[in-house]
Amino acid sequence: MFSIFDKNDYSSISIHDLDGRLGKIDLIDIREPYEYKDGHVPTAKNIPMRAILEHPEEYLNKSKEYHIICQSGSRSARTCKYLSGQGYKVINISGGTGSYIKPLER
């Protein structure tokens, strides 16, 4: 499904650059609901990876920009690659929730 040789049509920012943007962006946490409940970055909305990949049109609008986060940045990078190929404006959060140094919401 994904090739390491394909061009990335999305950008990435570090989890450490996210603080000033919280509350001003659409932040989507694509981890499973049990992971999200264990703790998530403030303002993040949970839409599991499988759901967003199977039916992006149910959750996303192609005229808006979304920041995608997971635990480490790997799932979010794969998701961004797919969604950008479908015409969605997405930004990967590298480092993910696991690298977030401030308190997580529960």
What positions do the PLM features span?
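Rhodanese-like catalytic fold shared by cysteine-dependent sulfurtransferases
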Residues: M1-H16, R21-I25, P33-E65, Q71-R106
